[in-house]
Amino acid sequence: MPEPTFHELAQLPPPVLRQLIRRGDYAGHTSGLGQRHLQANLVILQKSWADEFLRFCALNPRACPLLDVSEPGSPHFARLGADIDVRSDLPRYRVHRRGQEPVEVNDIGAFWEADFVAFAIGCSFSFEQALLDAGIGLRHLELGRNVAMYRTAIATRPSGRLAGPTVVSMRPLKAAEAIRAIQITSRFPMTHGAPLHLGDPALIGIRDLARPDYGDPVPLAADEIPLFWACGVTPQAVLAEAQPELYISHAPGHMLVSDRLYDEL
């Protein structure tokens, strides 16, 4: 049986897509998948870090809009889907150990610990369908790429051992489209809301749009403005500085696709 095309994958209901991912039959990015459904960034921490991280999310709701938190040791997000298992239902994960480069894997069952607490954080991929419905084209989708993401000079509000830079995702749009995109995305605070910045990237500490820190480069046309949304990769940048002994995250752009619609929250 031939592998499904990306267009075919985009039509799959989230439970079917997750089954495909769980079996190891898809390991690519999730931008453009699960149309109209919430996608979530993932952070998994040992319980000794969980309270600090929960407070960090509360202090930084633009970058870390919290969708759900698991019970200690549980790999399930009951609010997001009855059969979700965070150990296997994302296409790609990063396992981070103190002092080592992160390792990317497609399943984290072998790394799971009894005191792990999982956090689901809203993702801007969720509102992309609303932009498309309004006739606003998205360059990264047209090119079949992941979105471009950058570390910025915008500091997060600290919580205990957790502090560091805000990460943003970038989408280039013409001026009229940019105005409409701001209006549309401001309605969805649980998926990062309106952009944090638009225009000159240097003003927020980004040196070169052609060299994103995460994801893929997305070209900017002469008549376009870059718009920057707060991004759920922010916790990875912050945790990289805090250096827990062990934590697990999604690989940037490889999200959990939930059963909840993006406009339900």
UniProtKB/Swiss-Prot annotation:
<dbReference type="GO" id="GO:0016829">
    <property type="term" value="F:lyase activity"/>
</dbReference>
<keyword id="KW-0456">Lyase</keyword>
<protein>
    <recommendedName>
        <fullName>Putative hydro-lyase PA14_37210</fullName>
        <ecNumber>4.2.1.-</ecNumber>
    </recommendedName>
</protein>
<dbReference type="Pfam" id="PF07286">
    <property type="entry name" value="D-Glu_cyclase"/>
</dbReference>
<comment type="similarity">
    <text>Belongs to the D-glutamate cyclase family.</text>
</comment>
<dbReference type="InterPro" id="IPR016938">
    <property type="entry name" value="UPF0317"/>
</dbReference>
<dbReference type="InterPro" id="IPR038021">
    <property type="entry name" value="Putative_hydro-lyase"/>
</dbReference>
<dbReference type="InterPro" id="IPR009906">
    <property type="entry name" value="D-Glu_cyclase"/>
</dbReference>
